[in-house]
Amino acid sequence: MSAQGHRLTAPVNSEKVYIVLGLSFALISITFLLSRNNLPHVGDNIHSLPHGDAYRDGTKAILYNSPNFGSRTSLNNSKNAAFAAVLLLSLLIYGSRCLSQRNHLCACGNNHSSN
């Protein structure tokens, strides 16, 4: 058997798979947390008015005021959601740029930089 029959190969680099899985999990978690309804249940068993509203029919009149957040901040308001989206995109762009600027050792043995 000749020496050329057995070549050593580097193990498969699965780092990018784990990065994609981690970023996907983070994006799904952020989307879930920003889109879930944390408002208290307001109304009765037939009429649900979580954002405050008025309902009137022939026998019943309901008037619920909207929830007062006061000094509390809500993740559901559009300013915070937009800020979170911009921050997340900025971090993703920065992270992908840092990962792409690493020096990679090529199969030819040369150290190539992607600058």
Swiss-Prot record:
Its main location: host cell. GO terms for cellular component: host cell endoplasmic reticulum membrane; membrane. Residues 1-13, 96-115 are cytoplasmic. InterPro entries: Plant_vir_prot. Residues 35-74 are lumenal. Disulfide bonds: none annotated. Keywords: Host endoplasmic reticulum, Host membrane, Membrane, Transmembrane, Transmembrane helix, Transport, Viral movement protein. It is found in: Host endoplasmic reticulum membrane. Plays a role in viral cell-to-cell propagation, by facilitating genome transport to neighboring plant cells through plasmosdesmata,. This is Movement protein TGB2. It comes from Potato virus X (strain HB) (PVX).
